[in-house]
Amino acid sequence: MAERILIVEDEEKLARFIELELLHEGYAVEKAADGRDGLEKAQAGGVDLVLLDVMLPGMSGMELLRRLRRASDVPVIMVTARDAVMDKVTGLDTGADDYITKPFEIEELLARIRAALRKRGGAAQGAEGLTCGAL
């Protein structure tokens, strides 16, 4: 089954561009155009990764991130025009796994998605495969 990515982005052209690239890469995609819809879709379950804008109608991306972190460890990559160092620090300290600023190269975003999904899958897989012999 394809990994499912939720795009929470209010700029429709950008959301559609990212969606098409992700579909081309073999991911399943769901979109939300505002923070409240994004929260509902994320809480419904089955999401493997969230791409999250900061400036959203209805609920800010930071508030959505705070609420997600209360109940979930799903990887979240912030995708935003907010490029000040303190914006990045706030996003990462609030619980984002990664932070990329607009404009971005799609190849970099795809690489960051693969890395975040690898980390999520690798933690569970790696724990079973590690053993320590006699010391």
Regions found by a protein language model. Give the residues of each.
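Short, Lys/Arg-enriched segments at the junction into DNA-binding effector domains
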Residues: 4, 115-135
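Conserved acidic carboxylate
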Residues: 9
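The feature encodes the CheY-like receiver
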Residues: 15, 57, 84, 102
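Charged docking surfaces used in two-component/phosphorelay signaling
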Residues: 16-24
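Short hydrophobic/Thr-rich beta-strand motif most characteristic of the beta2 strand and flanking loop
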Residues: 26-33, 41
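Acidic catalytic/metal-coordinating carboxylates
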Residues: 34-37, 60-63, 87
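Active-site residues of response regulator receiver
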Residues: 53, 80
